[in-house]
Design a protein with these regions (language model features):
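Charge-rich, low-complexity N-terminal segments
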Residues: 1-46, 52-113
Length: 113
């Protein structure tokens, strides 16, 4: 698959996963997820879904067993919403970039005071 098509698939998955979390997920642990990026493997067998926690930090990230159960539920929802030959297996990966950036920003503000 061409890289342009992979980029389109990544964008589609990002939008669909975000929409599913907003509209269909009942578990409050996942309502604060902010999907940052999706990276699909070149063979389309898997995708890493990078997320952050809105107004949270790493201690707010659900345990791996919940993330695995969550990813299979989201994958089946994506399969029912989007016409794809094969929906990649999803792996949710916590991205703490925003949290780290806020920490650095707070540190810089405290130095200026």
């Amino acid at each position: 698959m061409t890289s342009n098509r992979i980029l389109q698939l990544e964008d589609l998955l990002k939008r669909e996963i975000s929409q599913i979390i907003l509209s269909k997920v009942k578990d409050d642990r996942f309502k604060s997820f902010n999907i940052i990026d999706v990276k699909v493997a070149s063979d389309l067998s898997s995708a890493k879904v990078y997320f952050s926690i809105i107004n949270g930090n790493e201690s707010d990230v659900p345990e791996i067993k919940f993330l695995e159960k969550f990813s299979s539920m989201i994958r089946s929802q994506v399969a029912s919403e989007v016409v794809l030959k094969k929906v990649p297996k999803l792996k949710f990966v916590y991205d703490n970039t925003l949290y780290e950036a806020n920490s650095i920003d707070d540190l810089l503000k405290s130095l200026n005071e």
